[in-house]
Regions:
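A short, N-terminal "cap"/entry segment at the start of jelly-roll beta-barrel domains
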Residues: 1-38, 49-50, 79-84, 88, ...
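Short strand-connecting beta-turns/loops that link adjacent beta-strands
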Residues: 33-34, 55, 74, 103-104
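A generic "binding-loop/recognition-motif" signal
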Residues: 35, 44, 55-56, 94-95, ...
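His/acidic/aromatic-lined binding-pocket segments of jelly-roll/cupin-type domains
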Residues: 39-40, 51, 57-63, 88
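Histidine-centered metal-chelating micro-motifs
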Residues: 47-49, 68, 86-88, 92-98
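Intrinsically disordered, low-complexity cationic segments
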Residues: 50-52, 112
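A short beta-strand-loop-beta hairpin characteristic of the jelly-roll/cupin
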Residues: 56-84, 99
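Ligand-binding loop in jelly-roll beta-barrel domains
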Residues: 81-84, 92-119
Length: 127
């Protein structure tokens, strides 16, 4: 039987992130085969390179700062504004990049990868 424990973090901003993708920090809050939940903080004026996931949804919840997600997929292409408290669900197979619109403040968001089993990060040609 798979033993699971309760996870409680009083202040997610007190977690220590590691450098991820060279221009942001990532602090993993919870990970099971069904999903991974992390706090990402994109540095001021930076962005995460365009990429896709072939099997995994990206669920974004903006918690501070101001960003946007530029996307392209079978439904066309567009921009999802991500001010504080915004939500975006990015399906597998959609190219997307996360941009911090501020040059002075980080853009922080909770990111849930679901499922975590089989997670893949595939850079696209314009990366």
């Amino acid at each position: 039987m798979n033993e699971q424990a309760l996870v409680s973090v009083e202040n997610i901003f007190s977690t220590v992130g590691v450098n991820a993708h060279g221009n942001c920090s990532k602090a993993v809050l919870h990970q099971v085969p069904e999903s991974e939940t992390s706090l990402f903080s994109v540095h001021p004026g930076e962005k995460l390179a365009p990429h896709i996931h072939t099997k995994t949804w990206d669920l974004f919840i903006a918690v501070s700062g101001n960003g946007e997600i530029r996307w392209k997929g079978k439904d066309g292409e567009g921009v999802a504004p991500m001010p504080t408290h915004a939500f975006c669900a990015m399906p597998p197979g959609y190219e997307h990049e996360v941009c911090n619109l501020s040059v002075t403040e980080p853009f922080s968001f909770i990111l849930i990868h679901a499922p975590w089993t089989g997670y893949d990060f595939v850079k696209t040609k314009k990366s």
